[in-house]
Amino acid sequence: ICRECFYIVFEDEIHQTIVENNLFKPGDRVAIGASGGKDSTVLAYVLSELNHRHKYCLDLFLLSVDEGITGYRDDSLETVKRNEIQYGLPLKIISYKDLYGWTMDDIVKAIGLKNNCTFCGVFRRQALDRGAALLKVDKIVTGHNADDIAETVLLNILRGDIARLSRCTFITTGEDGPIPRCKPFKYTYEKEIVMYAYFKKLDYFSTECIYSPNAYRGFAREFIKDLERMRPRAILDIIKSGENFRISTTTRMPEQGTCERCGYISSQKLCKACVLLDGLNRGLPKLGIGRTKGVAGGDSDCEQQAKRPERSRSSLQGKHGNVDF
Amino acid sequence: MAAAAASSCGGAGCGPHCSSSASAAAVEDAAAAAAEKVGRLSLSRECGKCGGGAAAVAVAGGLGLCGECFRANLLGKFKLAVTSNAMVRPTDSVLLAFSGGPASRVALQFIHEMRCKAIESWDVSNSQALPVFGVGVAFVDESVLCSKPRDEIEMAIEDIRSIVSSLSTGVKAMHIARLEDVFSTESEDGERRLREAVDMIGDDTGREDFLRCLRMLSLQKIAMENGYAKIMLGSCASAIACHVLSATVKGQGYSLPADVQYVDTRWEIPVVLPLRDCLAQELTLLCELDSLKTQQHLDRPSNGINSLVASFIKRLREENPSREHTIVRTAQKLKPFSFNKFSADGYHDFLPSRLRPKFQKFDSDESTFSEILCLMCGSPFSESELQNLESTKHKAQKKIDLYTAHCCQSCYFQILPAGENLNEHFFSLLPKLWTGKMDTISDSHSLLRDQIEEYLLEENDDGN
């Protein structure tokens, strides 16, 4: 398949995914979660192209989260700022510092490298929603690709997280919430995204997060790459399995509610972000990490990682941020 | 079973730690090194149950147990699984599938002990109690596909025989069946067809899964021909965890719950898994502690997705011994199928009265078994597979099309040869026990079609 045909097939597949799943309707204001990495850069580019070509009539925005990681996030945000100019999409940046009073640099100083991904994942998820609310958008789209979703299916099986297992393959989540999230790249392979970015010479930032240098090489990610080499369709087969799982009706699922402090969605009295923030502000950063004594019921919807011993967590850490659904 | 047999001790089996520090890690490493040296899961601390001073054995969950308590723990899980799922009734004959590996060896030992105890109770009660269930043992001989020297294979099979005959009260019978017998009663013809069918499968994983299907078919055949009411497998939590991930990777998320329950009645002879809650490491260790002889020279080297999954899980287990249980527990929360429990009228009549209400409740909730099962592996069809089957039925020109449509997507992709001619030849080789069912359905289907055509002709005549 030649380059031009690859472009057409790649873009049409994504278009088909968008249309068949009714991801958008005309007039929607859509925020693209933009990290500067290859997935979100390609997503911004392709969505902009398809919006023109197929006349979706969407208002597109770039939405970035500044975690406050010196030497990493500031550089990647420069990439997004260039994308803003290149693609003509307005950019909104929201930072942990503004929202929480803490940067990731501060957090890592307080708790060390271990577990800092828990804070970052929980905070980023909420920050994205808050940024979307400020932009008054109707939808958020993220660049999660097929490899990410397959990895999440496996991780949820490994962790015994049945609540997440039941919804991690949804192409749209949070439809009953204020701002739904969509994954147009749900069926798109990571290697195709890389190839597309390469041939189109798209400007993206590819350095991994400095605070989780080995996160990319988690066991699950490595396993999925081995699978893909052995049987390329395994990634889509995993997603299909995830879609076909039927949860037993006798399994108790966590109930949705709101945090009594900040109003964010939560199955507990306080959302995970407030619990973690409270710990930081009180000088007890370990609060909210690991096993929680005396807390009954299901996990908080915001919780990125299941409550597991520290020793086992690192091996299951997926790519930075991408396992957070 | 093969996966269970292939499992091995993976070093220290310490329970999970809520926190870790440098010194704790150092102690842990030392313990791991020591454990590795003795080649078993052992820590020098007191038994968590009886407090005895003997060398303790660590089990998943962090509890240290002495040899006796460890054994009692596993036997307790086995007995609980058997009784709380009504796996064996007093009138049943049970066929235990024995591969020579640690898991089925333990299952053999435990079911034997349960039977001995039942016999003692029966004797004491002067024959007023219920009769005692019977036990037979089956070994599926796959040596025709094995590349090892014939005499080595013969010795291994002789070991299998001696293990079974060494049990103090003899089992009812020992059945050794060659895998190729499911193809044909004539030895050479069966062998030829088996080899030819296997050689036509291009995918390593597909070949493995095909052999697994044949193994189940062979066990079913032995059980039906010899009057057994149940087939007991030694599948343990570790093998089931591997299966959960393998099935997920093959797109079988819909049907996977069928394979991980204690009871599976979709087959002619129901299949039960009493060791579902025990880990391969624990069973291997028990074989060592009790000097239970195993025979694993017949294990075949494995490539493909199944072995990739097994090595992945082994790696996870080394980091967290409870991981396998977590995986199985996740799968337990998926919805089982109607055939994952016994539902025949009167099935639970032999149960002690205190247990009966639990099962009767289920009986009243019972719905009709309506799943369509894959021709080869027996997986229930998902909605998309059913749709494909329905559309094929309407436009099927040849029998081959119906055969193909009755295979699940996983078998279709990894087992069926590409190309229609090859496909036709492949199906002609398959055991009649599989294709015969299809022929029956196909005949009734064409009969129905004939009736419809006659009706249309009559309608036409009336019109004239």
From Swiss-Prot, chain B:
This protein's pathway: tRNA modification; 5-methoxycarbonylmethyl-2-thiouridine-tRNA biosynthesis
GO cellular component: cytosol
InterPro entries assigned to the protein according to its UniProt record, in alphabetical order: CTU2, Rossmann-like_a/b/a_fold
Record keywords: Cytoplasm, tRNA processing
Subcellular location(s) of the protein: Cytoplasm
Any GO molecular function: nucleotidyltransferase activity
UniProt GO BP: protein urmylation; tRNA wobble position uridine thiolation
HAMAP family: CTU2 (MF_03054)
Function of the molecule: Plays a central role in 2-thiolation of mcm(5)S(2)U at tRNA wobble positions of tRNA(Lys), tRNA(Glu) and tRNA(Gln). May act by forming a heterodimer with NCS6/CTU1 that ligates sulfur from thiocarboxylated URM1 onto the uridine of tRNAs at wobble position.
UniProt record similarity statement: Belongs to the CTU2/NCS2 family.
Protein name (Swiss-Prot/TrEMBL): Cytoplasmic tRNA 2-thiolation protein 2
Species this protein is from: Oryza sativa subsp. japonica
Lineage: Eukaryota, Viridiplantae, Streptophyta, Embryophyta, Tracheophyta
